[in-house]
Amino acid sequence: MDLLFGSTNPGKLRELRRLVAGLPLRVVSPDDLGRPLPVVVEDGATFQANAEKKAVAWARWSGLHAVADDSGLCVDALGGAPGVHSARWSDLEPEGPASPVCELAGVAELELGPVAGRAARDERNNDKLLAALSGLPDPRRGARYEAVLALARPDGTLVGTVTGTCPGRIGHARRGDGGFGYDPLFVPAAELAAGEGARVRTMAELSSDEKDALSHRGEAFRKLLPMLAALARGA
């Protein structure tokens, strides 16, 4: 059975394909279909609302079961920013003091185009995050990754949604060449538990298997597996 994952982000596609490798499913991307995804304006109030809206729209468009992801980084010291604006945070004007960015989606988070353009935006986003937290000690650099996955049938019926969270802390400098987004700055809580004096690794320094075990998206994908297994069985 073909399953559309509504993303052109190669990192997200690799994660999902690794995690469903044992199921009789073929994860396809918009590139595999030879058609660009239709734009869905992400104007929902939460990650969940945006993920559900995309999954329903893309399932109807493709005629396939579809999975959509909405995810982001929420930093405690920034009142939850960048939150739903994580992908394009560096392109936005500074948020006002009353803007709970982790819950409000006032702009469309469109897919980010070529890999080179996405990497450049990641760099700008990380620069902005480092500047925003400049001078803050480790105890005030708490953060979490959040991911919501929504699954819809070809007729647009919503099957369900799942959520994954990865708590951690923002480092003081980039480390690691793996991952994408804020991974070079994000130190997962499991690494912090190593104890005083231990060298902790960022998400970008973990192997693929280690990241799958710890990440917000890995947790969400694992929660989604029973739904996907039922679909593969024809349930």
From Swiss-Prot:
InterPro entries: dITP/XTP_pyrophosphatase, ITPase-like_fam, RdgB/HAM1. The active site is at D70. Binds 1 Mg(2+) ion per subunit. Mg(2+) binds at D70. Its cofactor is Mg(2+). Substrate binds at S7, T8, N9, P10, G11, K12, S71, F180, G181, Y182, D183, K211, H216, R217. GO terms for biological process: nucleotide metabolic process; purine nucleoside triphosphate catabolic process. Its EC number is 3.6.1.66. Keywords: Hydrolase, Magnesium, Metal-binding, Nucleotide metabolism, Nucleotide-binding. Gene3D superfamilies: 3.90.950.10. Pfam families: Ham1p_like. GO terms for cellular component: cytosol. One of its GO terms (molecular function) is dITP diphosphatase activity. It comes from the Bacteria. CDD domains: HAM1. It catalyses: XTP + H2O = XMP + diphosphate + H(+); dITP + H2O = dIMP + diphosphate + H(+); ITP + H2O = IMP + diphosphate + H(+). Belongs to the HAM1 NTPase family. Pyrophosphatase that catalyzes the hydrolysis of nucleoside triphosphates to their monophosphate derivatives, with a high preference for the non-canonical purine nucleotides XTP (xanthosine triphosphate), dITP (deoxyinosine triphosphate) and ITP. Seems to function as a house-cleaning enzyme that removes non-canonical purine nucleotides from the nucleotide pool, thus preventing their incorporation into DNA/RNA and avoiding chromosomal lesions. HAMAP family: Non_canon_purine_NTPase. PANTHER family: INOSINE TRIPHOSPHATE PYROPHOSPHATASE (PTHR11067:SF9), INOSINE TRIPHOSPHATE PYROPHOSPHATASE/HAM1 PROTEIN (PTHR11067). Homodimer. This is dITP/XTP pyrophosphatase.
